Regions:
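Conserved hydrolase catalytic core segment
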Residues: 27-68
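Short, hydrophobic alpha-helix immediately C-terminal to the catalytic nucleophile
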Residues: 18, 42-46, 191-195
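Active-site loop/oxyanion-hole signature of alpha/beta-hydrolase fold enzymes
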Residues: 1-30
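Flexible "cap/lid" loop of the alpha/beta hydrolase fold
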Residues: 55-87
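Catalytic histidine-centered segment of alpha/beta-hydrolase-like enzymes
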Residues: 178-187
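Accessory cap/linker subdomain of secreted extracellular hydrolases
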Residues: 75-111
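Conserved serine/cysteine hydrolase catalytic core
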Residues: 102-177
Length: 199
């Protein structure tokens, strides 16, 4: 079930994930993170259990999270946001999943989405679907250079990541795709890297 995240922050979430790893007696793992969970991944990397590598899919950077786009325009991102606003989030995502998945998989995805939506609709008012994320969450965030980092991102975000908290001497960028959900369109490339790291 979905739990209320009111009063929770990223440190609480990192502690909860770490507790699960401990309870499962995981001694090392490959961490795969998308979007906002990228900053959560950075916090998990500080924990004692060894992370073999971070595979980050368009992880959120401080520069974008707290950017003033009126002063620093990001045309490609603005265009994607315009599309979402124009057709609505649900239609935008339906178009993306239809382009990416087989009809059977697409149907299953939207069945699960509907179940989660129904679960959310039955919650009390004031229910929070995600924890608070503040600028402080990005303070003192860095990744040790011994951890290999693979960042999947759209080509226009290359400079952003090279200047970000995810960049080390051991970071590799894999450019591709034309939307934020690269785990869908670039899944084979992502799986290949994870399999190679697992060997």
């Amino acid at each position: 079930p979905i739990h209320d995240q009111a009063g929770k922050n990223l440190d609480n979430l990192a502690d909860a994930v770490y507790k699960v790893l401990e309870e499962l007696a995981i001694s090392e793992y490959i961490l795969c993170a998308h979007s906002l969970s990228g900053i959560l991944a950075c916090k998990l990397l500080k924990k004692p259990i060894k992370c073999q590598a971070l595979v980050a899919i368009e992880p959120t950077t401080k520069n974008v999270m707290f950017a003033d786009f009126s002063e620093n325009p990001y045309p490609e991102m603005e265009e994607q946001m315009r599309l979402i606003e124009e057709c609505g989030p649900e239609l935008y995502f339906k178009n993306l999943t239809q382009e990416t998945f087989s009809p059977e998989t697409n149907k299953e995805i939207w069945k699960i989405m509907q179940e989660k939506r129904s679960e959310l609709e039955n919650q009390d008012s004031g229910f929070q679907i995600s924890g608070e994320i503040t600028e402080e969450d990005f303070e003192n965030v860095s990744i040790e250079s011994h951890v290999p980092v693979f960042i999947f991102c759209q080509a226009y975000r290359e400079k952003e990541y090279r200047e970000s908290e995810y960049w080390t001497s051991n970071t590799k960028l894999i450019l591709g795709g034309n939307h934020h959900y690269l785990q869908w369109s670039e899944s084979e490339k992502i799986a290949t890297i994870i399999l190679e790291l697992s060997e």
